[in-house]
Amino acid sequence: MTENTHAGRLIVLTGPTAVGKGTVEAKLRADHPEVWVSVSATTRAPRPGEVDGVNYWFLTEDEFLAREAAGEFLETAVVHGMAHYGTLLKPVEEHLAAGVPTILEIDLQGARRVKQRAAELDLEVVYVFIAPPSFEELERRLIGRGTETAEQQARRLETAKVELAAESEFDVTIVNETVDQAAADLWSVIAKEYGL
């Protein structure tokens, strides 16, 4: 085991599809610009308004698989049976070493892979689960988003049931009643872990 060069604990943020993870982390970043949120790589097509390098690193499947084979990812997963997602390791390590509050917003598969690799990489991690007030509210949010077909929505809701059942695997649960409250709760976790 190598000497720990990380000055802070990595915050892994997970929750079911359409729970508002991205909205909560955007509010957190607006209120606390000192927080760095890792930009995931993906092979899925950009949604309207998404920008390469800001929302995701949009890669072809060949590019993604080559970087995965080169060991450049902390974790990777195939999500909803459709697209590859992954977290590039080097930027995470650099931000942690600099003491910058660092968040990974990833799905359940990714969080489980980080758990598997954390000891090997000498990472200290806090796992945070963002939960909806109810399954019905989650369904309403997903349908209201209007970015998926009915078939994709049904597949995502089935995945969400599995994700919700895994809540007990996490250190902290934050219920996303409102974005402001959930972002404030997440900041409380970060402030505690980073001594802010």
UniProtKB/Swiss-Prot annotation:
Domain (Guanylate kinase-like): residue spans on this chain: 8-191
CDD domains, A to Z: GMPK
GO molecular function, one term: ATP binding
GO CC, any one term: cytosol
Chief location: cytoplasm
Catalytic function, reaction form: GMP + ATP = GDP + ADP
Positions annotated to bind ATP: G15, P16, T17, A18, V19, G20, K21, G22
InterPro entries: GK/Ca_channel_bsu, Guanylate_kin-like_dom, Guanylate_kinase, Guanylate_kinase_CS, P-loop_NTPase
Family, as annotated: Belongs to the guanylate kinase family.
Family matches, as HAMAP family: Guanylate_kinase
Role description: Essential for recycling GMP and indirectly, cGMP.
Protein name: Guanylate kinase
Organism encoding this protein: Bifidobacterium longum (strain NCC 2705)
